[in-house]
Every structure is written in structure tokens, then in C-alpha cells.
């Protein structure tokens, strides 16, 4: 079976997590870092960098074990995807990027103004060197 790293990107409420759960692969996203062992989500902005480090670490561990991975994060800016492109190359994983563009309403209470700012900062992924 082919080792695969799938990145699912999109604005909050676009269906990233829902789509990721349909893949036969280990699923990680930075938001998982903020879920406690009782399943309660508690976002802490000051820990966002740690959440992304955790997500990258879990992805690398799975790929090193030859387990395919799907990562669902907003990935608004190209540089946010760059570590994953490097991981795919390092572990010989086939890379796929999927963009979610629907608007189902976000479950984490992200303010509409914040989503608009993210929209304005959105960059296409194709120009990221692989």
C-alpha cells in the first residue's frame, strides 16, 4: 500500500474535519491539542504554536511507522504547509492537498471577522516547492 500524506485546508466551517474522518489514515489537526481527555474543547491562543508542533510531531511519527496521515488545518498561508511538504519528501509519502470551500458554520465559535481576515490572507498552495 502507498504511504500517503493528505493535507486538507480551508477556512473554519468548510468541512475539513468531517472530510478527514472519512480517510483510512491517522487523522491529526492542531485543534486536537485543545481537547481534554473528557472530550471538551478549550482553545488557548497562547498555545497555538505548541498545537501546531504537536500536530507536526504526530504526523512525523506516523509517517516514520509507514502509516498514512491526513492533516486537517486551515493552512491559510503557504509557509504553514511547508513542514508537511518536507515530511512527505523525507518519508517518501505521496502528497495530496485538498481544499474545502463549503460553509457549514464552524463549531469552535470563530468570529466572522476573523474568518474574513483569514480569507484575505489566503494563498494558493501550488507554488510551494515540494
Map each language-model feature to its residues:
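Short beta-strand-centered segment that lines the nucleotide-binding/catalytic pocket of NTP-utilizing
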Residues: 26-39
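The conserved Walker
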Residues: 11-12
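Hydrophobic positions on the alpha1 helix immediately C-terminal to the Walker A/P-loop
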Residues: 19
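Hydrophobic anchor at the beta1->P-loop junction of P-loop NTPases
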Residues: 8
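Active-site signature of alpha/beta-hydrolase-fold catalytic machinery across serine-
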Residues: 22
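Conserved glycine(s) of the Walker
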Residues: 15
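Walker A (P-loop) ATP-phosphate-binding motif of ABC ATPase nucleotide-binding domains
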Residues: 5
